[in-house]
Amino acid sequence: MSKLVFNSIAVERRNNYKVIDLFAGCGGLDKAMASTWKYATIRVTKESSESLWKDNPCLSELSEVFLADWEVELYDIPRGEQFSVKADLNDLCRIGRFEMTQKIVRYFRGLGFPVCRDFIGRIEVWIPKDEGNAILYNRYTLRPYYKDITDGWQIDVSHSGESRCSKKTLYEVDLDDHGVEVIVGTEVLRRKQVKQHHFQKYGGGYPIVNKYTKKMLNLSEPRSYDRNKYATKMKKVNVFIQTYLVTPQFQDALDINILNNGALIEVKPSDILMVDDKAKNLKYGDGYVGAIPRNEFSEHGPFTQPQPFKYFFVSLDSPQSNATRNRLYNIFQNGRDTSIIRQGDIETGTNRTFKRLGEYLTQPLSWVPKLSLSYKSYDTALQELQQHLMDDSRFIPGTNYIAIIISEIHKDTQEPRLHELYYRMKELLMKSKITSQVIYAPNIDNNSFAYFLPNIAAAITGKQFGMPWGLESLSQRNDMIVGIGASKQQGRKPYLGTAFCFDKEGQFREFDCCQAEDTEALGTSLKKALWQFCKEYQKPDRLIIHYYKKLRREEGEQIEMMLKQNGQQCPVYVVNMVTAVNDDLIAFDASKSDFMPASGTYVHLRDTQFLLYNNERYSDYGKADILFPIKLTITSANTNTGGILTKEDTIDIITQVYQFCRLYWKSVKMQNVPITIAYPELVAEYVPHFNDEDLPEFGKHNLWML
């Protein structure tokens, strides 16, 4: 029997009534000071905390006061008049949360550890380990809550990652402001936040290693291959709790008692649920029904074949690239890679056999040698490709083509000119109605290249309008499902990608992309998609929007207005989802060695919020792929539902999300994000790099981004 626990511990206050220090606001702050004040304090208003004003007449002349939960950050910022007031921190639980935050920050900074806020406001404690020429920090997040998953107080604890820090100060290294963070005493600051007193006392602080600073600091970012990050996270959380929290010093500093000796809080059995077993089933071309594409796609073939296509190569004109192209041709067509060189009695090279690409696709391959392009240099590649594609005599009208781009450039290269080449080639090909598949040349030499081929075959199948695998039974009524994903890249405008009208087989109908702030363009696309859906399927039973963020009230009103303008009235549900890798609350299966709950498990967190698990464990003893859960928040976005989410709708929507997680075709490996979010995110990641910063029409109707 599974036993699920949260990464959270139960605590109780020794005394609910406390004396706390509050401050009146202070005017005349410049923009930077005002920003710091907002970061380091919480605002308490008379309207929201009437009992505080009633019990403390000294506040009667004020409408608001502030609690400084991040005190060091306010070093050189003036404060208003101070008031020591009595408060029931169970009754005023919001103030109680931040009073506990204040004391946690004080405690760990008192131990000399750097402490900062993470991007969603949690406390992040950095625990150091000396590595000789650098300091490695394990980062832990803490967040107090009241009456969340318990009837009292809790502290959620998570391991959020590792960071490496130089032992040289800003005085000793010449770094610009580009993405640089520094550890200054017990603060973690951006370079531009470092002030004069930081230089005087700490030499400006110690730079943190990132992809921009690692060369200048001659240090690498912390990278280690961990086969089970889920178990590692669980173990590190337990060690941190027992080492730093379940101590008299910590409990006295917060004036709390940690219950059950710091044991993790168990999930209530009534909050552990499972999708229907049929929702897990996938079907393939020969009729086989399974659940693990990594083991099944190669043997049973695509559920629906890709449309016939012809392919050609695009690669650098060099002896090495030409040899690589010939090897890849032989692997695709003949299932062989032979590069044996004999010198006397000594043989060197490779002699490997593979399953031919056409066997994966269950159709013959058609290579067109005269279409292949060998460009002279990276500097001329785009111009040569454009001229190559302008020769219409090379291409047969009505024929599907795939360009196999053999790239010597790693996708994560830090050379901007080379990095952009990858995206621009895809854009040029799409403008000529040609999709593409990029293969990183060094992978061909990898001893595991045989395991790359199923991924390539699955992606090509999807790009050519086939289905590598499908759902045996899609949990869907006549629903219109829209996915909206986002991409925000450093130095570029954020973009939204959208995927519209997934049908009952899980197929998409159309993609689009726009700048994140262009809500008018997004609304126009949504109207067009709704009109098209009604034309093909009549009125939708429900409009379900898978959204990368929580829906604002005004956005919900815009959606409802759009429905009225189209003459439609139907329930609208918005599902916000985030991958819970470093989230505040995750459930672990304490009865398993890898702590991973079974695939299809979903855990009720609070209100309409759930954790959903998709992996490859389907029994108590099966092996689980290490995929973190996604956190779902389901909300009603219109008045047709009266704001009520029924049990039936909840089960339907969660099951839909689970099944869309299982239709990711960029790889045969299972994924934890539904394609309704993952595919639009890919689109939004690519488009900002395109020359026109727009998605070509051809790219709106196929899975070119796989």
Where are these regions (language model features)?
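Short coil-to-helix leader/linker segments, especially the first N-terminal amphipathic alpha-helix
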Residues: 1-3, 282-292, 449-464
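S-adenosyl-L-methionine
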Residues: 1-54
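A short, compositionally biased domain-edge/stem linker segment
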Residues: 2-11, 290-302, 465-470
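Short, flexible hinge/linker loops that cap or flank conserved catalytic cores
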Residues: 13-14, 305, 474-475
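Conserved beta-strand elements of the Class I
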Residues: 18-20, 310-314, 480-482
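Extended, highly charged clamp/arch subdomains and adjacent linkers
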Residues: 150-441, 694-706
